C-alpha cells in the first residue's frame, strides 16, 4: 500500500483539533418566558424580536461582541473584553427599564443576565465549556432585569465602570464542581422591591471646614450617602 495513502488514513483517524481561548461570556434569558408565551404567543414573539433588533443585537455588536448561539428566549454572546461585556449588559438592562416603563407588567419582557470570564471551546461560531456553563448558572441567579457576575469578572472591571456591586457570597452552581463567588451589579440608586440581596451603599465623601476656638481653620471629611 502506498505510503502517502497510509498517511492519509492516519490523518483521518486523528481527533479534530479543539480550539480553546479565554473569553468573557454573556448569557441572557427572558424571565417568565413560558408564562408570557402562554398568555400571548404572537405578541411576546413580536416584542422579543423588536427588543433584539433594536437593542440587544446592536448593543452586542457596538461593544465588540458576537452572538454565539440563540435558542428561543436565550442569547449567548462572547466578548474579547470583560469591560465591554459588562458595559453591554448594563446598557441593555438600563434601556429595558425605559422600554418597559409604559408596558403593562404582565406583558413586560425582562432579561436576566450572567457574565463569566473563562476558557471556552469554539466550534464554528458556537462556544462550549465550563466557562459558558458558569455564565448560564449566574444568569439563573440574577433578579428580573438584573446582572450577576463571577469573581473573575469583578476583578477585571472593578473601578473601571460607574456601577456598584452587591456581594452574594459563594454559591453552589448546578453541575459546577466548585462553589463560585457571585456578585450582582447594582443598576440604580436603591434596591428594587423584592430584591433577594442587600444593595451596597453608594457613599460620597465631602470636605468641610470649621474654626477651632483658637481661630485656626480646620478641614474634615464626611462620608455618607
Residue ranges of each PLM-predicted region?
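Catalytic NTP-binding/metal-coordinating core of nucleotidyl cyclase/transferase enzymes
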Residues: 3-4, 8-95
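Residues that act as N-cap/strand-start positions at coil-to-secondary-structure junctions
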Residues: 62, 202-204, 214
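Intrinsically disordered or compositionally simple regulatory linkers and C-terminal tails
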Residues: 1-20, 185-207
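Catalytic beta-strand-to-alpha-helix segment of the class III nucleotidyl cyclase homology domain
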Residues: 76-187
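Short hydrophobic/aromatic beta-strand or adjacent loop that forms the aromatic wall/cage
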Residues: 179-182, 205, 217
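A short loop-to-beta-strand scaffold at the N-terminal edge of the catalytic core in hydrolase folds
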Residues: 213-223
